[in-house]
Curated annotation (Swiss-Prot):
It comes from the Bacteria. PROSITE patterns: HSP70_1, HSP70_2, HSP70_3. The keyword Ribonucleoprotein does not apply. Induction: By heat shock. Gene3D superfamilies: 1.20.1270.10, 3.30.420.40, Actin, Chain A, domain 4 (3.90.640.10), Substrate Binding Domain Of DNAk, Chain A, domain 1 (2.60.34.10). Keywords: ATP-binding, Chaperone, Nucleotide-binding, Phosphoprotein, Stress response. Residues 578-615 are annotated as: Disordered. Acts as a chaperone. This is Chaperone protein DnaK. Belongs to the heat shock protein 70 family. One of its GO terms (molecular function) is unfolded protein binding. It comes from Clostridium acetobutylicum (strain ATCC 824 / DSM 792 / JCM 1419 / IAM 19013 / LMG 5710 / NBRC 13948 / NRRL B-527 / VKM B-1787 / 2291 / W).
Amino acid sequence: MSKVIGIDLGTTNSCVAVMEGGDPAVIANSEGARTTPSVVSFQKNGERLVGQVAKRQSITNPDKTIISIKRKMGTAEKVAIDDKNYTPQEISAMILQKLKADAEAYLGETVTQAVITVPAYFNDSQRQATKDAGKIAGLEVLRIINEPTAASLAYGLDKMDTNQKILVYDLGGGTFDVSVLELGDGVFEVKSTNGNTHLGGDDFDEKIMDYIAEEFKKDNGIDLRNDKMALQRLKEAAEKAKIELSSSTQTNINLPFITADATGPKHIDMNLTRAKFNELTEGLVQDTIEPMKKALSDAGLSINDIDKIVLVGGSTRIPAVQEAVKNYTGKDPSKGVNPDECVAIGAAIQAGVLTGDVKDVLLLDVSPLTLGIETLGGVATPLIERNTTIPTRKSQVFSTAADNQPSVEINIVQGERKMAADNKSLGRFTLDGIAPAPRGVPQIEVTFDIDANGIVNVSAKDKGTGKESHITITASTNLSDEEIDKAVKDAEKFAEEDKKKKENIEVKNNADQIVFQTDKALKDLGDKVSAEDKSNIEAKKEALSKVKDGDDIEAIKKATEDLTQALYAITTKMYEQSGAQGAPGADPNAGASQKTNGGADDNVVDADFKVDNDK
């Protein structure tokens, strides 16, 4: 059996590792380095360069050099090179092919399978795009695992006889994740995760670039950011300065002949101190603190419960980052793992678990965001809450919103808001062929299934007819990094507003339900209801009908209560007169959350589908 490699497909650098003799080993690339720049370049002669050689010539070939493609994964954006458009998956596949070739040269055999890591906060389409990139590169991706989780495997493989709670702080080139894990008896259990898929070392570089450009503009009146070649030189100088300031308090930025004007060539020669760098990037560092707080809160832990802090990603070498983590946690971060290599090592360990080379290790990861469906009134009804251990499967029974409704459209949403419109729609599908029946009678079972890769499948089944429909969520390409972060932030900011909206919709749904029950009861009881009682209940129903579609929630509540009591009074009278055990009609005190048929499933919730008017 051929080896299964572990790959850290990073924004700025990538790394590959493999299990050998029971221990993980990082594989050096063809240039002798243990990490490979995630850079692809296209030459005039059609040649394609990947890695360090591509990065070296990026200054002279900026238009055809692609960097940080990971930030585009899962989007519909394409990169235009000459007369061809490349998807992010295709560019990522070129990087994976380079890593695969280096691994094959090292192992002396063909490699066809891999475990690839992704940021913990990657959404479904980004994970699927990563799998697709692997497939394009000729790799069967056995598992997609989260980067902080992989890092914890690298940290904890030799500590499996201890019980520890670990906080993994992962600040890479383009993404930031924080995960809280519990390690004990060989089980690596993720308790929670949080992060920002658009925060990383690139943003620190950009702060330096902007500072240099602004200083140059002040002195020379020229904005270097309008010159692609100059901009690429600025980026390279900014990255170099950032790295040097991790070990020294001052660095010199020297860029001769950066541009020219009528007076002659222009040069940059300036010093940048660590203090100035810290000032420029203070906001970025502070942006990493809130996700730590949220992750701890979601895990139900305080910072005092954490035994170890593990720093992952090259950007954690920045002294201000280390200081911020230490100040918040009150603990010195562990130095036991290499921040550039530990994610790939963890991926290799997971590969060993899958092949049986590594024994007695169990990895339990989580889904980062809540998944649910849109129900009547535009409410987002959750089926799988965020930070649920995966793989997982959850079913819930829903019903129809109209009599004889032939089909339902199921809108799958992802996010933390109470209203579906405020979350991201991942996809829609339709269940047809529902047997004609009154509203609320059909039982539509919706099932969410998240596999160990975090990829979602959704199915819907009419329990009456057995008719079934399903969808694998692969088209959620418009869910941007900002939208994911905004989903959680908005959920907190508008929590009360969302709660109020949902309560108001439930009040209106209850009003609709009691009107429906009243009409049904009057029809079923017929002449058994006296003219006086019928007139009274019709008046109360009319009063509710006038207000139920308005915005006066208190008026709707009062009118609903009045009609409920009137209906209860006549049905009680009918029971007393007939002595029957089960008069026709429904008990209005059951509320809208119960079905009128006695055999309602306990798993039925107070939520109906929208009518699919196109059917």
